[in-house]
Each structure stands twice: as C-alpha cells, then as structure tokens.
Design a protein with these regions (language model features):
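Solvent-exposed loop/turn and edge beta-strand elements of beta-rich ligand-binding domains
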Residues: 2-267
Length: 267
C-alpha cells in the first residue's frame, strides 16, 4: 500500500514597510527659483519573513487630500490646504514582481497655487491594496507644505516652497517608515511506502496546481524544494516557479518514499 500525506500550514509572513520621505530637497538647481517642488514617497515591501515568495505584483496607492479640521498641534500655526493646491491626488507605488521590493513615488506642489506664506496641511492616506495577506496601514499622516516669501527681507508677494514634511498624526515625528504585514503560506507533500510490494527506489511525480485567491492576481513566484522528510529545508536551494499572468502556476516534482516536496511563498 502506498500512502501520500499532504499538509498545508501557515508558513510565515513578511513585512511591508513604507519609508515615507519626510523632509526632502526640492528639484530646483542652486540659484534658480522654481515654482514646482517635488518630494517623494518610498514604498518598501520587506520580504525577509516570506522565504520562497517573489515580490507580489500590484499597486499600493496613497491619497493626498484636504483636512476637515486642523490637527490640534497645527491649530493657530498652520492653515488647511485646498483641493486646488493638490497637483497629485493619488500616489501609486507599482510593484512588478521578481526581487524589486522598493518603489519611489514623486509628488509635486506648485508655489503658484499658494497666495500667502504659511504651513499648509494636507492628509495622506493609504488605500487597501486588495492583496490577500497584506494588511492596510490605517495610521493618520499629514503632509506639511511650507510656503515662504521668496525674499524674506523685502517681500514682494513672490512665494516659494521651502520644504515638504510628511509627519505622523500628532506631528511629533517624521512618518518615514510604515509597516504592513503580509502572511505567506507553505505546502508540503510527503511520500510514505508500506507493504511487501513497495519498491523504495520508485519515484513518484506530483503535479500541484496553484491559483492566486485574488480576483486580480498578485502572486509573482513561489519556491519548490525536495529532500528527505526530516531534512533541514532552509539549507536546500530550491527552484523558482513563476506564476502566470492569471495567477496560476503548475509545480511538478518527483520524490521517492521518505522524501518531501515543499512549496513556499504561497499567497
């Protein structure tokens, strides 16, 4: 008699971390006054806790908006920004799979859209990515755009943006690192033989069909390893299986009695 045991267990998780640029230099060359001031948001997905998984396909977006009320720390010292002053209402960090786990997203404000010096407050909100296993970061963040007189000593009405800060909810710190958590899974197949007619040297080929659970597929690749049932699979170099555009993949592996197939990085 030949018996096959298949188990599916939670394998691990990876952290998706946002390094949100908080105090950033403008794009104007020294000595040149530019109306536009471009800052950047850097989105990083930490893959260290998801061995075997490729960086998922998909976009993580942030919405730049106005605030209904100024946060308490800004009351009396800042003003509410307006919708007309927002040039980029949606910031998108697009990931294309493979190993590229950091995306930089520029966003711009224009000093011509402001009429007076001051600190202008806007909201920055992460939108749920719709990626199975990836949590949404719901922390409140603000963008502070500082507008100053071009010539503080002799103001002429000309303005420039001196800096842009992304800060946390209470305004006490730069909101430059935000962590999202992704849960990855593993699948193992073990072959046991029993009975007088079993041949320990026979190899059995298994075909495992994988399908991304998301309506829009995000999985990019998984890792397949084979070895002895009690082997330390962390020391085994596996094969990368790339997922198709529709989120499906087919894993084929042959093992003999007492051996195991391990597929890691499953969404």
């Amino acid at each position: 008699m030949k018996t096959t045991y298949i188990s599916r267990a939670k394998f691990g998780k990876f952290t998706a971390a946002i390094a949100a640029a908080a105090l950033l230099a403008g794009t104007a060359a020294p000595g040149v006054l530019a109306a536009d001031y471009t800052a950047q948001l850097t989105k990083t997905i930490d893959m260290t806790a998801a061995p075997g998984a490729g960086v998922p396909h998909g976009s993580i977006t942030f919405t730049v908006g106005t605030v209904a009320n100024l946060p308490s720390w800004a009351a009396g010292t800042a003003v509410k920004g307006t919708a007309a002053q927002i040039k980029s209402t949606e910031l998108t960090a697009a990931f294309t799979g493979g190993t590229a786990n950091t995306v930089t997203v520029p966003f711009t404000f224009d000093s011509d859209d402001f009429t007076a010096p001051g600190d202008y407050i806007f909201s920055l909100t992460e939108t749920a990515a719709g990626i199975t296993g990836l949590t949404q970061d719901t922390a409140a963040r603000y963008i502070v755009v500082r507008v100053v007189n071009t010539d503080p000593a002799a103001p002429t009405g000309a303005l420039r943006i001196s800096d842009i800060n992304i800060v946390n909810a209470d305004g006490t710190a730069k909101a430059d690192e935000v962590t999202n958590t992704y849960a990855a899974y593993g699948l193992s197949v073990v072959k046991h033989l029993s009975g007088n007619f079993a041949n320990a040297g026979d190899e059995f080929t298994f075909t495992i069909a994988l399908d991304d659970p998301d309506e829009t597929p995000h999985a990019s690749s998984v890792t397949v390893k084979t070895g002895g049932e009690s082997a330390d699979f962390s020391t085994i170099t596996g094969d990368t299986v790339t997922c198709n555009a529709d989120g499906t993949a087919e894993v084929k592996a042959g093992i003999t009695g007492g051996e195991k197939i391990e597929v890691t990085g499953l969404p």
